[in-house]
UniProtKB/Swiss-Prot annotation:
Belongs to the wax synthase family. This is Acetyltransferase sirH. It is an enzyme of class 2 (transferase). Keywords: Acyltransferase, Membrane, Transferase, Transmembrane, Transmembrane helix, Virulence. Induction: Expression is co-regulated with the other genes from the sirodesmin cluster and corresponds with sirodesmin production. The gene is sirH. It comes from Leptosphaeria maculans (Blackleg fungus). The chain crosses the membrane at residues 9-29, 32-52, 63-83, 295-315, 323-343, 358-378. It is a multi-pass membrane protein. GO terms for cellular component: membrane. It is found in: Membrane. Its EC number is 2.3.1.-. Pathway: Mycotoxin biosynthesis. GO terms for molecular function: acyltransferase activity. The keyword Transferase applies.
């Protein structure tokens, strides 16, 4: 039987090879669009399929992280190459990264270059611009924390402390989750957990769902802080171009705001691009109309559902979405219902107040927690809480001893 499996060295270099393929396609330019798609799309699909041959030699969370990035690159290819967004929208670097949280302002350049090697360099630049901060394609609602000219040494000190704080939070939650019947340590239990989370009472599932959300929050924010510090030290970015990954928790009082401003915006560019393409280019809906607004909403969450379902497929090597399609797919109807309830309340004379925000906080916590329960439960049952023990970590050792004490 013919196998599509490549030698292990290519599987290990899967992500760099995928990005090299995308940058090559971008460098060929829109004038050779048909040729570059025919050349690079089969290569992309072939490289993505290598995830099906990747052996699990470590915790399941490592496999999930790698496949999440693989699926992310698929949608980057759609955005850059199939939709030709960089050339169609004339992406450019902004002058001194003068941006606001609601979008970019003043331009420094006038779109991608035309030469092959110049486009390779341009592709490398935008590929390493996380969330495209400081570029004309920057996503909305990114929490801009620093003004232009913010001192680098202050930024490095502040972000280093922030990374340390989230590292401690991450280590604490990892030790706690490993101590539950639904987790463990990879060096002693390199299998799935002993007890399925789906066999515990509903409220326990709800609690563990939020524990997992906070663990993801701490892990991503720690990584984002470290990346910001390294980027600023190496002069690859300015402090203004390295904001926090998450928004202000004070905005966590509607499901819409939870997704649009509080949670990380790493997928915002891809989801909004697909939504705009369907609403304006395919369906020719009027900008700002009711239909356009909700088509973009449903398509955006559809893209997110497809990405996370694809990750589950690559991890399980089977047609299994781990309830990702349900969780992400149901968020759009919830937000649509929420919008109409809020609009009705305003028409009846209700105004924003601390009481309504508290009620909104409770509603949002329950709505996300219960709809996310099946998806998070599937990941935990797959071994998401079976962590790698850091034998040289004094902090982790102290936390383990503290939890094991009667």
């Amino acid at each position: 039987m013919v196998s599509a499996k490549l030698p292990s060295i290519f599987i290990e270099a899967q992500l760099p090879l995928i990005y090299a393929n995308i940058i090559l396609a971008f460098a060929l330019g829109p004038q050779a669009h048909t040729f570059r798609v025919c050349l690079t799309l089969p290569i992309l699909l072939f490289l993505v399929c290598q995830s099906l041959y990747r052996e699990q030699n470590g915790p399941w969370e490592d496999l999930l992280s790698n496949n999440s990035l693989v699926m992310f690159t698929v949608f980057v290819y759609i955005d850059w190459i199939l939709l030709q967004s960089p050339d169609r929208e004339q992406w450019h670097k902004l002058n001194n990264a003068k941006t606001e949280s609601n979008g970019p302002t003043k331009a420094k350049e006038s779109g991608p270059p035309h030469g092959f090697f110049q486009r390779i360099w341009f592709g490398c630049r935008i590929a390493t611009a996380w969330r495209y901060i400081g570029w004309s394609c920057q996503v909305k609602n990114v929490p801009m924390e620093h003004s232009a000219g913010y001192p680098r040494r202050y930024f490095i000190a502040r972000k280093s402390l922030r990374a340390l704080a989230f590292y401690l939070m991450k280590e604490t939650l990892e030790v706690y989750t490993a101590s539950t019947p639904h987790g463990g340590w990879w060096d002693t239990q390199n299998t799935k957990p002993a007890l399925s989370i789906k066999n515990v009472p509903l409220w326990h599932q709800f609690k563990y769902t939020w524990v997992h959300i906070f663990l993801a929050y701490a892990t991503l924010e720690m990584a984002n802080s470290i990346l910001g510090v390294v980027s600023v030290i190496l002069h690859l970015a300015t402090p203004q171009e390295c904001p926090s990954a998450f928004g202000d928790l004070e905005d966590f009082f509607t499901v819409r705001k939870a997704w649009s401003t509080v949670w990380h915006q790493h997928m915002r560019r891809l989801t909004s691009t697909m939504g705009l393409f369907v609403a304006r280019d395919l369906m020719q809906l009027r900008k700002g109309s009711f239909q356009s607004k909700y088509v973009q909403l449903f398509v955006g969450f559809g893209v997110s559902a497809g990405l996370h379902a694809g990750v589950a497929l690559l991890c399980s090597k089977a047609l299994n979405d781990d309830s990702a399609l349900f969780f992400f797919g149901i968020q759009a109807p919830i937000i649509m219902l929420e919008d109409h309830v809020i609009a009705k309340g305003k028409s009846l004379g209700f105004k924003d107040s601390p009481l309504w925000r508290f009620i909104g906080f409770v509603w949002t916590t329950l709505a996300i927690g219960f709809t996310c329960r099946a998806w998070v439960g599937s990941m935990i049952d797959n071994g998401m809480w079976v962590h790698a023990r850091k034998k040289d970590s004094v902090i982790q050792g102290l936390l383990i001893n503290a939890i094991q004490q009667p």
